[in-house]
Amino acid sequence: MDNHLPHIELLQQQVALFNNQQAYNELFLHFYPSLQQFAFSFLRSKQLSEEAVSDVFIKIWEKGKSLHTITNLKFYLFTSTRNTALNYLKKQKGRQNLLPDDYWVELKSVFFDPEQLMITAEMIHKIHEAVQSLPARCKLIFKLVKEEELKYREVAELLNLSLKTIENQMTLALKKIGSAIGFDIHSSVFFSIKSL
């Protein structure tokens, strides 16, 4: 669960109701790194991904008072970023249909709750190697679920894939990671399935 949610909602309200520039800047700083990395997975250009995310935030500012009607700002921003990136691709390359296997993503970290499991530096290294060895689509789905804390259903909608595909890709990712660290995924609740 995103611990920043109440703060994000308050910032969203401040922007919507009072055009609060400071709140807008905080939202930008909070979401920009993840959105830029997500846009990069489509565009493969740092400059274009930065422009795409900037365009998304310009639209957020222009939305003004209607911003309060958005119930899940994080999902809205990821969806807007995806759409903006795909529009850039259409304009730049004439590429109409980008397949999820074409996505490229660099994971900044793999996060697991330390209360659930004590992981040594060697295990972290093994996990990182396992994640990096995942197919591109599988890696992107894993990142969106585990790092960005999106639900399976949200990832399915965001990537225009079936819910079953998301479930299968997460199962594949978790099996590969579990295998890399010598962990039997079937005999433990280490990896919890996100609620649909």
Specify the residue positions occupied by each region the protein language model found.
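Helix-turn-helix DNA-binding module
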Residues: 129-132, 136, 140, 148-165
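Structural recognition of an alpha-helix C-terminal capping motif at a helix-to-coil junction
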Residues: 37, 51-58, 71-83
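Sigma70-family region 2
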Residues: 17, 57-72, 92-93
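Internal acidic/polar
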Residues: 5-9, 95-117
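Amphipathic, Lys/Arg- and hydrophobic-enriched alpha-helical face
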Residues: 28-46, 131
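Arg/Lys-rich amphipathic alpha helix in sigma70-family domain 2
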Residues: 79-99
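C-terminal edge and immediately downstream basic/flexible tail or linker adjoining helix-turn-helix-like DNA-binding
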Residues: 3-5, 158, 174-196
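N-terminal module of bacterial RNA polymerase sigma factors
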Residues: 1-33, 196
